[in-house]
């Protein structure tokens, strides 16, 4: 099991950049393939060739019959299946590592350019180019890469390859061995002189192990297909949301264009009034007419005598300007 440690660490890093279904697939891969294959596989299939016996004494007949019965050992076939199925995942991990390193280099270069005191147009163009490149690399708040853009394409391709390889190895196992281990294998191959019966050790235990690995392979294939469906639905939902945002009408008072043509009402300042002027009275303007009316009213008020006058205040001396009593009487009469 020590030989699988490095591969386990690599696949553990892939789990940080996978979907929920992908994490379940990796769990099935670790527990039901690596552990079971490492712990129980060698003990079950360790006596595969040593206990394979045939009822003949012909030299070399047992070896050729074993080669015909098992073109490749089950345990080695499953190890090969595990390596091939894990290869697309490792390719995806390589893409993740490449994008992470690239994002780090871009951030470092951006910091160096922003630290420059002078604002050179070439520096501004370089910063704009770096921002465009970083926009293509979607990074989450926790520092992990989001599965979008080119990374999404690599992830979908890896899942497709895993599905094809899984189905291919299941078909190959069925063509080579079938789904059960027969206790007796009949062999007729040179240099065997006749039909030879060969006997397999612990066929029932090996049949159970074969069925178990078959079920694990089917579960892995189903998980890959579910992940493909999940990724397809995810891409479709993103496309629908993006289309809805594009087709949504702008809010009142806003415009989708930065400088849309708008119509404004205004009053012309250089032209004369469009309506005719108000008519004047007696050829005078309104202000002159009001002033004439006010003057006429004042003249009438000054010529009109008051009906009642209060008696003047009694003082110690007689006012020289007071009119005589006869004049007052005449005025009131």
From Swiss-Prot:
Gene Ontology terms, MF aspect: gap junction channel activity
Pfam family, one: Connexin
GO cellular component terms listed in the entry, alphabetical order: connexin complex
InterPro entries per record: Connexin, Connexin37, Connexin_CCC, Connexin_CS, Connexin_N, Connexin_N_sf
Disulfide partners: none
Entry function: One gap junction consists of a cluster of closely packed pairs of transmembrane channels, the connexons, through which materials of low MW diffuse from one cell to a neighboring cell.
Subunit description: A connexon is composed of a hexamer of connexins.
Protein's name according to its UniProt entry: Gap junction alpha-4 protein
Organism whose genome encodes this protein: Bos taurus (Bovine)
């Amino acid at each position: 099991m020590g030989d699988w440690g490095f591969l386990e660490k690599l696949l553990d890093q892939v789990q940080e950049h996978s979907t929920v279904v992908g994490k379940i697939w990796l769990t099935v891969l670790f527990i039901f393939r690596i552990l079971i294959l490492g712990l129980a596989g060698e003990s079950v299939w360790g006596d595969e060739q040593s206990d394979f016996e045939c009822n003949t004494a012909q030299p070399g007949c047992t070896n050729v019959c074993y080669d015909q019965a098992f073109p490749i050992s089950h345990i080695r076939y499953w190890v090969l299946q595990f390596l091939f199925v894990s290869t697309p995942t490792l390719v995806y991990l390589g893409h993740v590592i490449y994008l992470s390193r690239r994002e780090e280099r871009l951030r470092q270069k951006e910091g160096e350019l922003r630290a420059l005191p002078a604002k050179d147009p070439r520096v501004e163009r370089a910063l704009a180019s770096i921002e465009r490149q970083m926009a293509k690399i979607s990074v989450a708040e926790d520092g992990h890469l989001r599965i979008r853009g080119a990374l999404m394409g690599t992830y979908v391709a890896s899942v497709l390859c895993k599905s094809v390889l899984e189905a291919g190895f299941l078909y190959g196992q069925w063509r080579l061995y079938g789904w059960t281990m027969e206790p007796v294998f009949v062999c007729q191959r040179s240099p065997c002189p006749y039909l030879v019966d060969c006997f397999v050790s612990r066929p029932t235990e090996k049949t159970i192990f074969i069925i178990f690995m078959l079920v694990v392979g089917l579960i892995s294939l189903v998980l890959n297909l579910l992940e493909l469906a999940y990724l397809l639905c995810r891409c479709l939902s993103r496309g629908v949301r993006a289309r809805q945002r594009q087709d949504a009408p702008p809010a009142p008072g806003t415009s989708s264009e930065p400088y849309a043509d708008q119509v404004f009402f205004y009053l012309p300042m250089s032209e004369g009034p469009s309506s005719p002027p108000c008519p004047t009275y007696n050829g005078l303007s309104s202000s002159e007419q009001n002033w004439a009316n006010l003057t006429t009213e004042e003249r009438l008020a000054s010529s009109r005598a008051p009906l009642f006058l209060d008696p003047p205040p009694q003082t110690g001396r007689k006012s020289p300007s007071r009119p005589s009593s006869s004049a007052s009487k005449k005025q009131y009469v």
